[in-house]
UniProtKB/Swiss-Prot annotation:
One of its GO terms (cellular component) is postsynaptic density. The modification N6-acetyllysine is found at K123. Sequence repeats lie at residues 7-17, 18-29, 30-41, 42-53. Component of the large ribosomal subunit. The ribosome is a large ribonucleoprotein complex responsible for the synthesis of proteins in the cell. Binds to G-rich structures in 28S rRNA and in mRNAs. Plays a regulatory role in the translation apparatus; inhibits cell-free translation of mRNAs. Keywords: Acetylation, Cytoplasm, Phosphoprotein, Repeat, Ribonucleoprotein, Ribosomal protein, RNA-binding. GO terms for molecular function: DNA binding; identical protein binding; mRNA binding; structural constituent of ribosome. This is Large ribosomal subunit protein uL30. The modification Phosphothreonine is found at T16. Signal peptide: none annotated. It comes from Pongo abelii (Sumatran orangutan). The modification N6-succinyllysine is found at K126. Residues 7-53 are annotated as: 4 X 12 AA tandem repeats.
């Protein structure tokens, strides 16, 4: 009987197997904790992005109301309201460059306008305005409004990530590249560009040059200036109409 009882005894679990089971259980707990932490982080980030969007919307509305109020006050006093000098331009290359001077080629390269119907944002200052004058016969440019900036970035926005052109389908892509500058989402990127913020250069360099479509209805006269009924040169606020036709 004793022999039968000994046979029925459950064999002891090897120590190595116990250790494996412990390690597996610990690993599972770590993974669950990490997953939970990531979930909470995503939730917190979504909330932050929502709050930022609300704040920017309020800021844009305030800017618009201030402009309206200033114009109204000027009219009331019998004066003309002169808005502040624009700080932002959107530049579109409209012509090829066969046979042009090396200087024009160089400026177009600096503006990152390597192909016809490429577009880029430019911070306006004395140096950049001089550059635009040099290449004016080959570009159409003007002052984009908030709607244009918004639609360009949302519809045609690509980022330069590891020297590759990547579609901005996720805020995480922006956060990874520009998070160190406090830019973590599309709304941050749009705000930095539109207001020409302190990190405009980094935000603008992150954006790949926009590849626009040929304008609906075609172009009138590429070689003639806009003020003479053509397409080239500074069209001020009218650039927004051209953007609509090409976006």
């Amino acid at each position: 009987m004793e022999g039968v009882e000994e046979k029925k005894k459950v064999p002891a679990v090897p120590e190595t197997l116990k250790k494996k089971r412990r390690n597996f259980a610990e690993l599972k707990i770590k993974r669950l904790r990490k997953k939970f932490a990531q979930k909470m982080l995503r939730k917190a980030r979504r909330k932050l992005i929502y709050e930022k969007a609300k704040h920017y919307h309020k800021e844009y509305r305030q800017m618009y109301r201030t402009e309206i109020r200033m114009a109204r006050m000027a009219r009331k006093a019998g004066n003309f309201y002169v808005p502040a000098e624009p700080k932002l331009a959107f530049v579109i290359r409209i012509r090829g460059i066969n046979g042009v001077s090396p200087k024009v080629r160089k400026v177009l390269q600096l503006l990152r306008l390597r192909q016809i119907f490429n577009g880029t944002f430019v911070k306006l200052n004395k140096a950049s305005i001089n550059m635009l004058r040099i290449v004016e016969p080959y570009i159409a440019w003007g002052y984009p409004n908030l709607k244009s900036v918004n639609e360009l970035i949302y519809k045609r926005g690509y980022g330069k990530i590891n020297k590759k052109r990547i579609a901005l389908t996720d805020n995480a892509l922006i956060a990874r590249s520009l998070g160190k500058y406090g830019i973590i989402c599309m709304e941050d990127l749009i705000h930095e560009i539109y207001t020409v913020g302190k990190r405009f250069k980094e935000a603008n360099n992150f954006l790949w040059p926009f590849k626009l479509s040929s304008p609906r209805g075609g172009m009138k006269k590429k070689t003639t200036h806009f003020v003479e009924g053509g397409d080239a040169g500074n069209r001020e606020d009218q650039i927004n109409r051209l953007i609509r036709r090409m976006n």
